[in-house]
Each structure stands twice: as structure tokens, then as C-alpha cells.
Regions:
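N-terminal "domain-start" segment that seeds a small globular fold
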Residues: 17-49, 109-110
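Short active-site neighborhood of thiol/selenol oxidoreductases, capturing the structured segment around
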Residues: 46-64
């Protein structure tokens, strides 16, 4: 019994240290987002549009207090790292709330609405447990920051400097 408990503990330790993914899976890449104009686009087409550039993905919602409090930090990043593409993926409860939130909080960047939010293929892939959530995709199209919840997190800043 002791050996089984020990092996189980070792397995759990190993799994908790697993490396985050460096590429989106096929289901996430094929997930559908909605543009401000109302068009449907896939994550793959969004990323291909910015191939060769560093991308910050901000997963947020207008109802999220932490997201709104974090906006000044995002705006500071945008001011300092002007060559970076900023994508905002909204988990708002509806398109109108999403659009109002963008205007109300003067969020600058490219905006996309995720209709199925956490229940989408993208939501499953990134395992959204908290927002805001920030990710960084490098110029080689690799996910180099998978999960930070503060826009001034050292991991995020380091990735933008590279």
C-alpha cells in the first residue's frame, strides 16, 4: 500500500510539473471567433494574419473587475512595446456587452468575441480558470507564455523583451 501511495504521489508531482504547450492544438486553431464587424474567423486565421510578429493575447470580459483593473498595465505594455500585436479575446455574455466594454474602457487593439467562452475548443485548450489571462506568442509562432494573470508579470515582460 505504501508503494502505491508513493507511486501515486510521484505521478501527481510529475504531472503538475508538465511543460505548458508551445503550439495550439487543431481544435483550438479551428475554433470560431467573431470580429467587431460580425464576421466569423478561426484562431488559425487570426494568428496567420500576424505571422512573424510577437503577439500578446488578453483573455478578458467587461464584467470582470480584475480585467478592468489590469487595463492600465496593458496600456503601459502597449506604450512600451509598440511592435507587439495585442489581441483581446472576450468572454463577455453577449456581443453588445462586449462592444460596450471596448468603448467604455477604451481598449485598443484587435478584438474578437468567443461565443462559447470557456466551453469552446479554445477555452478547453487554455483551460481558463481565471481572467484576465495573458499569453504570448513569439515571432516563431510558439506559445512562450501560456498562463499569467497579471500584465506586468515578469514572465510576460521577459518574453516581450526577447
Amino acid at each position: 500500500m505504501k508503494k502505491i501511495s508513493y507511486l501515486l504521489l510521484m505521478l501527481l508531482s510529475y504531472l503538475s510539473c508538465a511543460e505548458p504547450p508551445t503550439q495550439f492544438d487543431e481544435a483550438a486553431l479551428n475554433d470560431t471567433f467573431i470580429t467587431l464587424e460580425g464576421s466569423k474567423v478561426t484562431l488559425q486565421s487570426i494568428l496567420e494574419k500576424h505571422k512573424g510578429k510577437t503577439i500578446v493575447i488578453d483573455i478578458w470580459a467587461s464584467w470582470c473587475g480584475d480585467c478592468i483593473r489590469g487595463m492600465p498595465k496593458v496600456k503601459a505594455l502597449q506604450k512600451e512595446y509598440t511592435d507587439v500585436v495585442y489581441l483581446f479575446f472576450s468572454l463577455d455574455k453577449g456581443i453588445e456587452a462586449w462592444k460596450r466594454g471596448i468603448k467604455r474602457y477604451n481598449v485598443e487593439g484587435e478584438h474578437y468575441y468567443l461565443p462559447k467562452a470557456k466551453k469552446s475548443a479554445f477555452g478547453d485548450f487554455v483551460n481558463i480558470s481565471w481572467i484576465p489571462r495573458y499569453m504570448v506568442i513569439n515571432k516563431a509562432s510558439e506559445i512562450v507564455v501560456f498562463n499569467v494573470i497579471e500584465a506586468d508579470d515578469n514572465k510576460l515582460i521577459k518574453a516581450l523583451k526577447n
